[in-house]
Amino acid sequence: MTNTVSTMILFGSTGDLSQRMLLPSLYGLDADGLLADDLRIVCTSRSEYDTDGFRDFAEKALDRFVASDRLNDDAKAKFLNKLFYATVDITDPTQFGKLADLCGPVEKGIAIYLSTAPSLFEGAIAGLKQAGLAGPTSRLALEKPLGQDLASSDHINDAVLKVFSEKQVYRIDHYLGKETVQNLLTLRFGNALFEPLWNSKGIDHVQISVAETVGLEGRIGYFDGSGSLRDMVQSHILQLVALVAMEPPAHMEANAVRDEKVKVFRALRPINNDTVFTHTVTGQYGAGVSGGKEVAGYIDELGQPSDTETFVAIKAHVDNWRWQGVPFYIRTGKRLPARRSEIVVQFKPVPHSIFSSSGGILQPNKLRIVLQPDETIQISMMVKEPGLDRNGAHMREVWLDLSLTDVFKDRKRRIAYERLMLDLIEGDATLFVRRDEVEAQWVWIDGIREGWKANSMKPKTYVSGTWGPSTAIALAERDGVTWYD
């Protein structure tokens, strides 16, 4: 059952995320008739606009970032009329009355989206409270990063929960809005084919890769203070681990799903001072070639020395009955050869081959779930090659390919934020992250960082356009595992 609000407040509405993702997502929902006709979207930032001026600004953002086949003049005009604007200094609580004047009755519900730096959260919450916009009918969405470690994350969450209850807080991880990520739950729990094998008896190992070809790309200040472990592993990749490893929830209600995810985070085997050398690899890209062009190294781009990692590979374990003994190899990095996010589940080989050795080597079955750039699900199978085979069957590994883009080519491809924005407006918290999840994630991440510090581990330089340091290959190879590149 939905609980739709009548007003949305969008902080940071002139920022890059708003222009590229948030405003286009809201437009897409409205163009498809998924937003109420009387929904008011109150936008705010420090930029000096009136409502008409901001509507002009928003129109330019839509023209630039919405796919041309989704743009429609009538739909655009209808959406722009939903937008209202007030210039507000988020650090001055007395200015929030301007937002209250634009919002109308709060009892009809308000969805508040803080697309701002975490350092501004407390000021925003104080202003919302003072203006009467933080009552029981409000819900609050927070963009990452939610802290730099457990202590700072707790500080943010404590400040938020002094005013809002946990059920009012919607912590965003945009990976959870991706269609293929959501499809992982359907794949696992909607098909009898996989569940009997989805455990340590049937699965040899799991690989999760999130690879980027870009370097800093304008994120110098944030990224150098964060690094790949905190930027990507703590949030996106650990959420993917949870969706692969979680037990079936009783139903698809928000807390039922999140209860099972947090059990996975708490079951992650700690990586400490004694195991960081054997279970983690860190790297930092040097100069090289990316996209056919010569590119500078990280330190040259940054303009100063830095020990921040731009690549990390980890051998992780989930210590419970289902997954005992199954390694999860995870890696992420910048300036890698391809932009790709994927999960590869490798099943155990057949216990005995009945086929002639001259027919080829049996390969273990694999399930490959590609999240980006294309949304694809593939399964590898061994088949017999056509022929008379007088000396025994000749076998080959082939991939059964389910391209969601092709299968559902008559459906619009939505960006992840469309789903998340709609769920926020309608009050469905399933794809948002609960506080205990965040805390359990940070406990594991902090242990790794403490191990790096205690052992004075520094990132190893790798050439841009390669798959990270050679030690990352060795991390898997010494277990007889090859990264799926």
From Swiss-Prot:
NADP(+) binds at R46, D89, I90, K144. InterPro entries: G6P_DH, G6P_DH_AS, G6P_DH_C, G6P_DH_NAD-bd, NAD(P)-bd_dom_sf. Belongs to the glucose-6-phosphate dehydrogenase family. Catalyzes the oxidation of glucose 6-phosphate to 6-phosphogluconolactone. This is Glucose-6-phosphate 1-dehydrogenase. NCBIfam families: zwf. The active site is at H236 (proton acceptor). Its EC number is 1.1.1.49. PROSITE patterns: G6P_DEHYDROGENASE.
